Amino acid sequence: MRYGEVSAVDKQALDLYLEKLSNVQVQSLNPTEQFAYWINFYNALTVKAVLDHYPVKSIREISLGGSLLPSFITGGTGPWQAKLIEVGGEAVALDDIEHRILRPLFKDNRIHYAVNCASIGCPTLLPAPFTAASLQAMLDRSARLYVNHPRGVRADAGGLTVSSIYKWYQEDFGGNWQGVLAHLRRYANPATTQMLAPFSTIHADTYDWQLNDAASASNTMQEPGRG
């Protein structure tokens, strides 16, 4: 993202888009449309939260209400529990969308590749919105992009290191490291498949909370934590 290059006109367009989404009669949508709708809503709200507080070095600097995730993960801050907008007369937070709607209702671990938390360690924010027609293809594309990038998984002399997403949400990936490995192999390209072949478990996990800002000079991963 190039947050510093977003114009006032662009911000107004984003506000109008969010207003349009907030006025949608969600119950009138079929399940596939709802799935795409909530992904787009989450990502647009995240971008707005960053733009409203930019410049910041990390989304964790935006102290609006923390997160459902433990404070040792998020630093106890962030915008995730703040009620940022109303949908159908009900105030909604980012955590509501991810943990009370998307994950429990759709039960698809590819959600973790679709929702973007504005950090270098998170999956890529695709340039186009999700639609009912494109949903499955875009979810698969997002999964492959992440699994086949060092942000998702990498190997070195110490063993196999994966994104902390697979630790935080391990229950969504089979409930153990073997389930995570099976998931990774499902979306791995030939090179990643070969890299994964020697491993039967995961050595460490890592996550980079730096803002996914193209203006940032650093794009390095943080030191891994033990898995």
Task: Describe the function of each predicted region.
Residues 1-227:
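Interaction/scaffold regions that mediate signaling and macromolecular assembly across diverse proteins
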